[in-house]
Amino acid sequence: GGLVALVVLPTLLYALAFLNVYRGEHPWLRLSRWIYAHVPPGTTIAYEAWDHRLPLTLQQAGVLRWPDEFHQPALDPYVPDSAAKLRAWLEQLAASDYVLIASNRLYGSTARWPARYPLMRRYYECLFGGALGYRLVTLPDVERQPRLGPLAWVADPFGAAGLASPLPPERERPAPLTLHPGRADESLTVYDHPRPLLFQNVARLSPQEMARLFNDLLGEEIGKNPVFDCQNDRGAIAHNPAPVYNTISRRPFVFSSGDHLDWRKDRKI
């Protein structure tokens, strides 16, 4: 009897707490309403491919609002890490006003695989820590977590990916008694109660300034042949094509000043 109670009681408590997830508005709707209310149309909001693009289409103050009011370029973390990918990302980050991470779907997978995605892991570390010049927009009550009275269960997608949480303490401890069960399966969190993150570009760093945070990951040749010519105030690619080696494949990627910034077009092997 005691063993049954030990199993059934916590399960029942969590089930009741999880039902409360559906009592509030979905986090993506809450964040969408904030964006429409505070971000001017025409603003550039970069988002992650393979995840949801926000804001959603909805009624705001009696007016139908559309995501197409904003410029929303996609950043694809699953593209194999390379100097070409890094260059395209940094150019886009420098040109964007906000970076949206709708859920832990991408950093929860790429950051946990540093052997394959060393640049992505460093990117999330720098983004979350503010080194890329982006600051987390603190949004009150944007999340909904399983909660029952003073008890809440909050999964830790950041720690599971080996990353420090960028969230303020009140979002990590939404209740007097907060349990952190660790990593939850993606299907349990991404759709029902994701933890969306919106970062604002406050420092307006150049691609060259951001590139210095990644130089040690791009191989031994990076000191002689950087991805960006930092002496060029215009930020153009170095005029003399030179191989920059990826630490995974060690294959050279040759750049010239005339190359297009889209990684799909400028990758040369």
Regions found by a protein language model. Give the residues of each.
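Signature aromatic-anchored transmembrane alpha helix within multi-pass, membrane-resident enzymes
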Residues: G1-A15
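C-terminal luminal/periplasmic domains and tails of membrane-associated envelope-modifying transferases
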Residues: P10, L16, N20, P27-I269
